[in-house]
């Protein structure tokens, strides 16, 4: 389809309830990573436009928070329905600007919508407490109230789901939002906002501001009207934004980098482990925060796992995400390709064994062959740095304690995976792995009903699940005396 003819393909930002260009009329070109072709333009906005979005959100907060939970829930459900009705259009926009295969893009849109459905239901379950009073003439009541205006900065690797996972709980709780999408993937965000307005959500409640990251960020962090900040991205940037948030003491949620281990024990079902490894490593061409960075395989099945994994990797189809059957799309930009290449070169210089892949693919300069390197060691960059690309590095271990030590030997703590048929070992690994999320005999663990988030340098807070709405609420205690 011709995106230019699609009503959901918006080339204006949504600020203070209006679709508009930047004050200075500047525009930023957006390119398709698969073809390098120009897709379109978005406004290059800055501080002034962001301040208007914040003021509009703050002014509309009273109106939004005083709607009943049932009213907010109904609007969110309409938004959910509209997203699913426009599934193919949204998926094509997403694939065109981000690169992932069309079927993966459809899966992401469905996943994104699931958070809206979930939090539409959670809006009606924001409960408080009545606490037994220590005083005979007093009663203690605890209730929860929306925190206020929320600002969200979202990444390019999941340009739909990372927005709805933040915006849906905010809206459900009664909070207006300002979204700053990644510069590489703004069109998905703008399309989602269009559908939110069609669903009846007031336009001033959800601004989408595109443009200069520094200026937009400065406006957000300087404003006392923005009470909550949420970010998904790299750990270094997350730390910087946390520091900036401290000046106005915002409540902060961060979903940051990872260095996920994927542990395969001798007693594992190898075929199942390889299937799990494929999705945990090569989904979105390895560009996911929960993507496996280190495969830890026990010595008894080490070579068998390598050979089965190699055969599966070599069967993956690389191509433009809009081509039928494509399984591996492009990396997002040349810097991403260079990082993968540097990790491969470093590993091979330190006695790594190249099993398959290792080169830029003939399809185009941003396409990279799924790569498997065996005999990895802790001196390699891949042992400590998140590759964020289609490189699978395999480390060998002998004992369970050694696997735990190797897995936990990182500053990160987002996701970990483990394959074993020993129930006792599965429980021990779940408890001893220092990660916010652990997948036992499963390579795809993300869903809307479970809490998503990490520990250590991988972030603060949880998204999704019944816990995900708490970051958008304040707890208020009231004592009624003289009774």
Curated annotation (Swiss-Prot):
GO terms for molecular function: succinate-semialdehyde dehydrogenase (NAD+) activity. The keyword Oxidoreductase applies. The keyword NAD applies. GO terms for cellular component: cytosol. Disulfide bonds: none annotated. Keywords: NAD, Oxidoreductase. GO terms for biological process: gamma-aminobutyric acid catabolic process. Belongs to the aldehyde dehydrogenase family. Involved in the degradation of the pyridine ring of trigonelline (TG; N-methylnicotinate) into succinate and methylamine as carbon and nitrogen sources, respectively. Catalyzes the NAD(+)-dependent oxidation of succinate semialdehyde to succinate. This is Succinate semialdehyde dehydrogenase. It comes from Acinetobacter baylyi (strain ATCC 33305 / BD413 / ADP1). The lineage of its organism: Bacteria, Pseudomonadati, Pseudomonadota, Gammaproteobacteria, Moraxellales.
